[in-house]
Regions:
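PLP-dependent enzyme catalytic core of the Aspartate aminotransferase-like
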Residues: 87, 162-163, 344-346, 354-363, ...
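A short helix-loop-beta submotif of the ANL/AMP-binding
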Residues: 138-144
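Conserved core segment of the aminotransferase class I/II
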Residues: 225-304, 314-316, 399
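Active-site phosphate-binding strand-loop segment of PLP-dependent enzymes
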Residues: 144, 149-220
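Helix C-cap/helix->beta junction micro-motif
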Residues: 31, 139, 199-200, 230, ...
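Conserved glycine-rich beta-strand-loop-beta hairpin in the small C-terminal domain of fold type I
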Residues: 287, 303-317, 325-339, 373
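N-terminal small-domain helix-loop-helix segment of the aminotransferase-like
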Residues: 2-6, 11-103, 110, 277, ...
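Conserved PLP-anchoring active-site segment centered on the Schiff-base-forming lysine
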Residues: 114-136
Length: 404
């Protein structure tokens, strides 16, 4: 029989959030072992439910959602997103500049496929949400990682960004609020990055899926709102803020000047048409979700589940000898650092695999987020405090075997 292998286009594509360690976790679950899965930010798995009005909308619109929609999405959803962008002070956004997708993930891949030729470069943060690096590679481009500095609240290193720009650089990706670090970028930093994009004719891709999940009185500033003269592609959605990750509701907004990117927009339209449309029934909940009461706010205030769980896991990490972390300002994740002077750890993937096998908890290693050293891992702080306390005990016990 003729042997078939995976496409060579996938040679440099990796997505370790659902990689080999997950495969081992699935094998263990199939054998009846109970695994606490902290590899993805999936609110429903931890008892978070969608707002009642969202479910009501879904039921009421089921019959009206049996056919295809416009490839960019239904009018009511795009209109609601346009109004949301106006409130956020996005410049020069019309309804035709908005694309609905089956989650942001689909749109990230589409945005890279429409832009890149072989050898083109995209600046991507390190650490990153690994789909960005994978999508660049799949499209034939090269992801060039710029450093985010843990000692400076995980903010992007401006000098490092400048040093990575070449004649092949087409764009820069900003993940703000950041996954996996929970960092939230101040306006002054965003303006510096916008100036770099302006001077080098770069497209800005802004992954802002956690913009409604900010804590401690901080405010998220959309990069597009500060860049009226720079073409920006902003990504957002409802998976996290409205606890409906399984519905797959994401959107992409084009803002700023567009005359010089007409060819790129033609490519986006072509790719959008090829997939016909995103899930029409899920699109029906966008208008209700973005208008009126935002129930996620209650989860992010003192006493709210996410707020209290974030505080607990941050303090718990500080109490484990040899671990440290920057306190997240937003999102669902914390990215602890392991002191390798205290612990013998040279392979972070093996470290989280061993933790899975011994303690039945699934984490993601730092290099799964394209971090350069084997000294970090990501924790999802969606479990309730009593479960997070168990993780603290398990990690404290587990680390003892690595002590120098």
């Amino acid at each position: 029989m003729k042997e078939y292998n995976k496409s060579s286009k996938l040679e440099h594509v990796a997505y370790d959030i659902r990689g080999p360690v997950l495969e081992e976790a699935m094998r263990m679950r199939a054998n009846g072992e109970k695994i606490l899965r902290l590899n993805t930010g999936n609110p429903a798995e931890f008892g978070f439910t969608a707002p009642d009005e969202v479910i009501h909308d879904l039921i009421m619109n089921a019959r009206d959602s049996e056919g295809y929609s416009d490839s960019k999405g239904i009018f009511s959803a795009r209109k609601a997103i346009m109004q949301y962008c106006q409130l956020k002070k996005f410049p020069n956004v019309d309804i035709d500049d908005i694309y609905l997708g089956n989650g942001v993930s689909e749109l990230i891949v589409m945005s890279m496929q429409g832009l890149l030729d072989n050898g083109d470069e995209v600046l991507v943060p390190m650490p990153d949400y690994p789909l960005w690096t994978a999508a660049v590679s799949l499209a034939g481009g090269n992801a060039v990682h710029y450093v985010c500095d843990e000692a400076a609240e995980w903010y992007p290193d401006i000098d490092d960004i400048k040093s990575k720009i070449t004649s092949n650089t087409k764009a820069i990706v900003l993940i703000n609020p950041n996954n996996p670090t929970g960092a939230l970028y101040p306006k002054e930093l965003l303006l510096e990055i916008i100036e770099i994009a302006r001077q080098n004719d770069l497209i800005i891709f802004a992954d802002e899926i956690y913009d409604r999940m900010v804590m401690d009185g901080h405010v998220h500033t959309p990069v597009a709102s500060l860049a009226p003269d720079v073409f920006c592609v902003s990504m957002n959605g409802l998976s996290k803020s409205h606890r409906i990750a399984g519905f797959r509701v994401g959107w992409m907004v084009l803002s700023g000047p567009k005359t010089h990117v007409k060819g790129y927009i033609e490519g986006l339209n072509m790719l959008s048409n090829m997939r016909l449309c995103s899930n029409v029934l899920a699109q029906q909940v966008v208008q209700t979700s973005l208008g009126g009461h935002q129930s996620v706010d209650e989860l992010l205030l003192p006493g709210g589940r996410i707020y209290e769980q974030r505080n607990f896991i941050y303090n718990a990490i500080q109490d484990i000898p040899g671990l440290s972390a920057v306190k997240p300002k937003a999102g669902l994740y914390i990215f602890p650092k392991i002191d390798r002077n205290m612990y013998r750890i040279d392979d972070d993937e093996q470290f989280v695999l061993n933790f899975l096998k011994q303690e039945k908890v699934l984490l993601v290693h730092g290099r799964g987020f394209n971090w350069q050293e084997p000294d970090h891992f990501r924790i999802v702080y969606l479990p309730r405090v009593d479960e997070l306390a168990q993780i603290q005990d398990k990690m404290t016990r587990f680390l003892k075997q690595y002590r120098r």
